[in-house]
Design a protein with these regions (language model features):
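Alpha-helical transmembrane segments and their lipid-water interface positions
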Residues: 17-23, 64, 68, 76, ...
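Residue-level recognition of pore/gate-forming positions within transmembrane alpha-helices
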Residues: 24-25, 57, 100-104, 130-133, ...
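Membrane-embedded alpha-helical segments that form the functional core of polytopic membrane enzymes
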Residues: 21-71, 106-107, 120-134, 178-203
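Peri-membrane helix termini and adjoining interfacial loops of integral membrane proteins
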Residues: 35-36, 73-80, 167-172
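C-terminal membrane-associated helical module and adjoining short loops/tails
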Residues: 1-19, 138, 156-159, 169-312
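Multi-pass membrane catalytic core of lipid/isoprenoid biosynthesis enzymes
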Residues: 54-55, 73-126, 216-254
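Intramembrane alpha-helical segments
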Residues: 2, 9-10, 83-173
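Membrane-interfacial alpha-helical segments at the cytosolic side of multi-pass membrane proteins
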Residues: 22-31, 103-111, 158-161, 240-245, ...
Length: 312
């Protein structure tokens, strides 16, 4: 029983789900709520609806993780045989059932939030996320970059959807908000999420070259080679570092020394370390360590939202 529960928790990739929940809740309370308070209006997702929105995102992501592993069993037996869960701890039929249940609950929860808060089209966007994750699992992840870009966009959507759910009803009603501030921070964090997710997805493809090539996948590293994949990742890391440097210089103008120090130590320096490791890594173990480092940079990026409470 305990083995089954532990296997299920690993199958849905609980750390990634915590990231999603944390991102959406923090963004609500550090960006959206202050902007609404400034305008003298109650947030659309007040009364606990932000937690339901985050839960719906978590459910959809969990369902997507399950269906991804379902279609990847043979590949995972080559790339990471010790981490295969479906068919070893959880029957394939149960995996499909859990995917359907979790995804359906995520969509229905989105519809419920839409009906109660008038967050228009939220149910439809949740359904679109489920469909994209399914198509990714059966087709897109085996093709060069298309699957990587889909996951990067969905990662960015975890930020965008909060602003979408909070503001689309206000636009429909013609209400006035300090929307420029919300928009600026929304695209800042969504862009940060997109770049890091894209980098991580390509690094994971570099890690999984052996199993992917054996089963006919045409990922970027397989099609163009590891060196081309390194250059692709390096370009995005340079973009990321440039943006982080600009952001650090910007906050220093206001004397926000603690924020600048945090950004330098926990975002810029780890990103430089990642860049250096990129051209020294040659095997799956090295690429896995790089993928883990990207996750820590993501977490550090999410936690920068806490500084918004101090400065904005």
């Amino acid at each position: 029983m305990l083995k089954g529960i532990n296997a299920f928790i690993r199958l849905i990739r609980w750390p990634n789900l915590v990231f999603i929940f944390l991102t959406q809740v923090l963004f609500e309370f550090t960006v959206i709520v202050p902007a609404f308070n400034e305008a003298g209006k109650p947030p659309n997702l007040s009364g606990g609806y932000i937690y339901l929105l985050a839960l719906s995102s978590v459910l959809i992501a969990a369902g997507g993780n399950i269906i991804n592993d379902y279609f990847d069993i043979n590949i995972d037996l080559v790339n990471k045989p010790g981490k295969v869960i479906i068919s070893k701890y959880i029957h394939r039929h149960w995996a499909i059932l859990w995917h359907i249940v979790l995804s359906l609950c995520g969509v229905l929860l989105g519809i419920f939030i839409e009906l109660r808060t008038h967050a228009y089209l939220l149910g439809l966007t949740n359904l679109a996320c489920v469909v994209l994750l399914f198509i990714y699992s059966i087709v897109l992840k085996r093709k060069p970059l298309s699957g990587n870009i889909v996951i990067a966009l969905l990662t960015a959507w975890t930020v965008l959807v909060v602003t979408f759910a909070e503001t689309n009803v206000l636009f429909a009603e013609g209400s006035v908000l300090p929307i420029s501030k919300i928009t600026r921070l929304t695209f800042l964090y969504a862009g940060f999420a997109f770049i890091l997710a894209l980098v991580r997805e390509v690094i994971k493809d570099m890690e999984d070259v052996n199993g992917d090539s054996r089963y006919g996948c045409r990922t970027f590293p397989i099609l163009f080679g590891l060196n081309a994949a390194r250059i692709f990742v390096a370009v995005w890391l340079v973009v990321l570092l440039a943006l982080l440097a600009i952001m650090t210089i910007y906050v220093l103008q206001f004397g926000w020394w603690l924020s600048a120090l945090y950004c330098t130590v926990l975002l810029i320096l780890p990103s430089i370390k990642l860049f250096k490791k990129l051209f020294k890594s040659n095997d799956g173990k090295d690429f896995h360590a790089m993928s883990s480092l990207v996750k820590w940079i993501m977490l550090a990026g999410i936690l920068t939202m806490l500084f918004l409470v101090l400065h904005i």
